[in-house]
Swiss-Prot record:
Taxonomic source organism: Rhizobium rhizogenes (strain K84 / ATCC BAA-868) (Agrobacterium radiobacter)
Alphabetical list of SUPFAM superfamilies matching this protein: FMN-binding split barrel
Protein's UniProt name: FMN reductase (NADH) RutF 2
GO annotation, biological process: nitrogen utilization; uracil catabolic process
Protein family: Belongs to the non-flavoprotein flavin reductase family. RutF subfamily.
Molecular function per GO: FMN binding; FMN reductase (NADH) activity; FMN reductase [NAD(P)H] activity; riboflavin reductase (NADPH) activity
Entry annotated with the keyword Flavoprotein: yes
């Protein structure tokens, strides 16, 4: 008696464009804190909204920040080598949209109150937390640069609910 034959058909591999969209849809389901990353110095004033920010280590305090090379903030961050990660809280949705779009740089900063800590990068006065950093190293990450940043000063505000971005919408937790 002969064993029955089984025909296995592998699913068609997605095209590069389909894979890219599939990946973007998956990343939309990965909730993340909403941050405004700012810089100022010889390269100019700039800022952008980011969710691709995470802790690397606490010894010494180090952050990872991903920055798209096509971002209008890229030349300034690259030249200044300082930045501040300002973690947003409930009520900052409009500010996030300003920094996430094509709004001219000075109009972005007019929407809030700012100060500075050690590096001179703008610190959002009512951010949940602000992490003032010096860029220590930069690695290639496809369309983005991966910035490894030494945290040199921290400002925390009490209370507030963190603003996260999940499923292409803002949520407070």
């Amino acid at each position: 008696m002969q064993a029955p034959s089984l025909t296995v058909t592998a699913p068609a591999s997605p095209s590069p464009d389909e894979r890219k969209q599939e990946y973007r849809d998956a990343m939309a389901r990965l909730g993340a804190a909403v941050n405004i990353v700012t810089t100022d110095g010889p390269g100019g004033l700039a800022g952008f909204a980011a969710t691709a920010v995470c802790s690397v280590t606490d010894s010494p305090p180090t952050l990872l920040v991903c920055l798209n090379r096509t971002s209008s903030a890229y030349p300034a961050v690259n030249a200044n080598r300082v930045l501040c990660v300002n973690t947003l809280e409930r009520g900052h949705e409009d500010l996030s949209r300003l920094f996430g779009g094509k709004t001219p740089v000075h109009e972005r900063f007019e929407g809030a109150s700012w100060s500075s800590l050690e590096t001179g990068a703008p610190v959002l006065d009512d951010a949940l937390i602000s992490l003032d950093c010096r860029v220590k190293a930069i690695s290639d990450g496809g369309t983005h640069d991966i910035l490894i940043c030494d945290v040199v000063a921290i400002r925390e505000n009490d209370g507030g609910q963190a603003l996260i971005y999940f499923d292409r919408r803002y949520h407070a937790i």
